[in-house]
Amino acid sequence: MKFGKTFPNHQVPEWAHKYVNYKGLKKQIKEITLVQDALFRQEQGAASQDGPARRRGRESKEQYLGHPEVKKLLAAFFFALDRDIEKVDGFYNMQFMEYDRRLRKLLSSAQLADITSVQRGATGYLHAPLPQYIAYGERERDGLPERYVPPHATDMSEDLAEVLTILLELRSHFRNLKWYGELNKRAFTKIMKKLDKKVGTNQQHSYFQARIKPLEFADDTPIVKALATINEILDRISPCVKDLQDKLRGEDRRLLQGSSSPIDVASQLVTKDDGAGLINELISMYRSVVLIPTRTLVTLLNKSALSRSFSCVDEILGIIPTLGDPSDINGRNFFHHHVIALGKKRTKSLEERDNINSLLSDSLDLEAAIPPEPNTRLVGAFGPDGVNSDDSPAPLSHILQQLPAHLRPSLLQRDNYKRTPLHYSAQYGLCEVTRIILQALSEWDAWNADVAIDDIDVWGDSENLTPLHLAVIGTHPLTVSTLLSFMNPEKSLNSPRLLHLATRLNSPSLLNSLLSAKGFDIDYQEPENLETALYVACKLDIYEAAEYLVKQGANMELGEKLFGWTPIFAAATEGYARIVQLLVDHGAKYDLFDESGWTPMEHAALRGHLDISQLIRITDNKAITRPKFATDWNKSTRPTETTNGLLSALTPSESGSTTTGSENKSSSLTPSTSNEMYALPARSSTSIDKISEPNKGNHRKVLKSQLSHGKVQTIKDTQLPQQPIKSFGHSFLQKDESVILLTLGTNDNRSTIPAVSLNKVPVAKASSTELDTALSLLVTCMDNLDAEPVMLDLPLHENLDSVTFKVPYKKDSSYTIFFDIVPTYGYSMANMNRENSSGMHSNVGNSTGPAYLDAQVGQCGSRLHYDQLGRDTPNTYDQRSRHQASQQKEQIATKKQSKILGRAVALLDSAPTSVGPNRRSIAEAITIPIIGSDTLEVLGIIRFDFLVVTPFVHKNLSVGPAETYWKSLVSTRVIGHRGLGKNMNTNKSLQLGENTVESFIAAASLGASYVEFDVQLTKDNIPVVYHDFLVAESGVDIPMHELTLEQFLDLNGERQRHQDAREAHRNHRSPNGRRLSMDDSSAELIKRSLMMRGDEDRTARDLNTIYGDRMRLTRTFKKNAFKANSRGHAIASSFVTLKELFKKIPQNVGFNIECKYPMVDEAEEEDIGPIAVEMNHWIDTVLEVVYDNVEGRDVIFSSFQPDVCLMLSLKQPSFPILFLTEGGTAKRCDIRAASLQNAIRFAHRWNLLGIVSAAAPIVIAPRLAQIVKSSGLVCVTYGVENNDPEIARVEMDAGVDAVIVDSVLAVRKGLTREAQDADTL
């Protein structure tokens, strides 16, 4: 999955609109390339009509960088890029200054000094000594020594919890901001790299150095220092926990024993509501009322209010000079503390007071994953509308009534976060407390109903959050309604974005509260992407919110900015069936084109959501249901005439738009007006996934012509010569080479276990493990011939391709793989090379120098330009090499810059469980621990599986003549399925047994150019032709690899008790001497017996009964109620080996050999056990037979098992490979086989000839055939749908190269007749 796809998923949700507009910049690059292509075609003139317009790399004369139109677009791109840089840098600086202010405030607070003695540290923050507070001991007042009252342990626990909360919150904020800067820096780097690659500029390095590297967000050093300071403080706080816990337990014992210490007496007086006694006790403690610390009075007032001790409240209000404590760590007054206490529901039971240790243990375990959790709330809340809080209004109401006038401003006082008590009541959903506060402000004439409660200038805190924002984030609909009820109903609110936030929270009641206020439009579109709240709900599968919005009349036809997608596009593409059904039931239009020319039906079908594509299927427009990309089925559409315009960009989440969106950018499709209304924009990215860009052609013109005029300019019309389908022969493994394919995680999409899982890190070890920053995974193989490790950013993307290493061939597969956890930006391969040279990490390789720094690190990694990242350039590297000694000292000072944080090691020869020679486990993910480099503790685990591809050696192994793969495939053809067709449980027509010699010969004689059959391996390693994984003819289910060839060919035959020829002939030979399957020999004996008794009429019926009874308990018979190639259902024939088939079938008949190797879910469905033949051995055995007997015959390999296909591609260059996919007709756990889209990606990556898809997605959406063709792949279909000549013709008109059918004769005749009729016209 590309960076653009995952970029939004790694963003801090509340800051989403502050990131670089990556999609928009990417689309601007696409627009530049389209102009360059057009200029190139114009320059080539008529020659461009004979082939695709393809500019050759980065030749300046082909980039047209001096052309006015290109210069104009480049200027617009850099202008937009500069604005994004300013936006990111400005936001980053503003947030950093705020967090820095909070941290410095904390470091100078009395509470922190009371908890732990923080000395002058080594970081930049502890640059000055902290104020000396005497927490426990003597202090002087007016020159006289006085005993200072030590803080109550409970107060200490509250201070500790408060300090801890601030530290963890700041730590989270700094980490989020660090990730924000790193992610944007990564985005700028990638977009500049893309500009250089696509447009041909050379701006990446210079632009980064001049415009990005000098900015604050590109240098995380201050944030690293801040995090180091926080970790240092947390390290010092941790030892205090046990001491404080002991003190709490001691106080609990004193309370139970009726202790009479002054502090305990004050607490008991508050509980008894003895106000007068409380004041007297305080006077006795502090000698005078004026000497009682304000902090003590505020704390006692809060305790009295929480205890409903109104007498104590009144007494304290009479003597307290102010409600705010100047030394308060957060600058909060009584009202702040009281509202927060109500929100957190802090009671004073002994059990809950004893939970400080659990609080710390819960809070001090820090997640090591880098990006913030997408659904993490910005602030804490304890259930909707304070359901778990103490929303008790009586104490606060009493205090507000008794509050002296000079203390009333405290209700609007702001703390260090610029929040008033109203902010906190909204945050915790205390709707009654909110009502009391607003009512009091109204009575005091301190409330202006004409000021919107979401006015940031008036109510915004330090992060521009108002009480309304906090109530929405906390999902408090009643609190929202309470806030809005005190506003002027005619006053409009200013934050329509809150509607989208409420939608993401999936709260219909919250949406209802917001929509009841003026200023919230249900159809509001966000300016950046024009997405409505309904679109967000449909895109994220938020059903309840979507249902509410639809029922409230939300416009379902408003398109977003990028491709004009309406909500039904988003839901259909993601496969959200409930959402699609909801939209269809309420009248949403689905006969629409997006800006790239595709319908929701086609998007769903491409991605394997066939149930959805049936639900929104378009049946009344021939431009969609019967496209004609080739008017003669005997002639194919050339790959150069493919839908390049429709495939030139990625999915909407990967591309962007810079144009202003219209209210509805999707075109309505009706039978009478579709051709006129449908048009593809001249410069637009596409909404269909890009598979590749091998063909830059004129197919966009062809498609537009076909949709507008119903006629396509075909090969015959243009008189173009036939072009190769694919270059003949591809790179393959030499006899001394192997390939290792590592799949991080697993290809089983049912697994929810991440590939890399890092443990929670205790705060005490955070500074030593250093897992609190952006991390990457460095995968290295010691034997890698390219000496290039692979760097992958964490968290790993979904659907990540395999990591590939080419290594020397070792018979025992004794390869070692290292998985290193390193800082994303603090680690460089230059450091790794230095470590190698010093013997620290010898596994990584010994390449040195700038060329190595700029190495391509693998197909799945990214090119490591350290100069881009503001770290190392070739010059600085040379200089550093000359001063290695000083650099080593610097490494010690800043160990993070060159440190491997953790490592896991896999020995591939012993990693999987041994299950016998030439056998393997079908599915076995390997799990290994990650060991910390310093502590040697387990930091987490890595889960992966692997495949080692060994070379195939044969005397005939060579690249054939320089022609084409399957060169005769320039005309659409019919392929016989399992010969003349697979057997079915019907008596409508006579059937030849499938996968038999007779069936293959019959198919060839009736016009099939190729015959398709299934090959499996027996126990004694002989390839045989058989379809089912389980052999059921014996009456029991036996996997093929558990039967020898002799057992298979003579299956269920009576054991020869005598060796004489007469008995052998009678029991096992037919009159013509051919070898029979047991079905035939048994049938002969039974038939003869019945005929001798005169029961000829019952013969057929009895045979069916006999064979049915024999196999009635097998899985195959239970599933299908019959068995293929069995007497009674077909003309049964003998089984055959692959070698025999080469000898018996005419040379002119091509073979489509399907390699029948089970996938994980197939093995589970058939219950064949977890053991299979080792794949290298399986394929080598089959290839051996093919190369020994091919003798010029056309041969194609195909398989549903993706690993078999890629292995066949890597082992030999002579025969093309087709990847079989069910295209969503059946659910497959292997992500590569889950959809037509993934099949195309897989086939293109491994240089396969094409795909063989189930016909269903192509029948539903015929234009998808051009998606396959545009990727340079052959498109073949199979399935019962192909037996209908009319449907087969539709597929071929759409560009399908071949159809695999059961009714060869009928389909061939139907197609021929239509072709002849077309010629006569």
Swiss-Prot record:
It catalyses: sn-glycerol 3-phosphocholine + H2O = sn-glycerol 3-phosphate + choline + H(+). The lineage of its organism: Eukaryota, Fungi, Dikarya, Ascomycota, Saccharomycotina. The keyword Hydrolase applies. It is found in: Cytoplasm. Keywords: ANK repeat, Cytoplasm, Hydrolase, Repeat. GO terms for cellular component: cytoplasm. Glycerophosphocholine glycerophosphodiesterase responsible for the hydrolysis of intracellular glycerophosphocholine into glycerol-phosphate and choline. The choline is used for phosphatidyl-choline synthesis. Required for utilization of glycerophosphocholine as phosphate source. This is Glycerophosphocholine phosphodiesterase GDE1. One of its GO terms (biological process) is glycerophospholipid catabolic process. Residues 972-1311 form the GP-PDE domain. GO terms for molecular function: glycerophosphocholine phosphodiesterase activity.
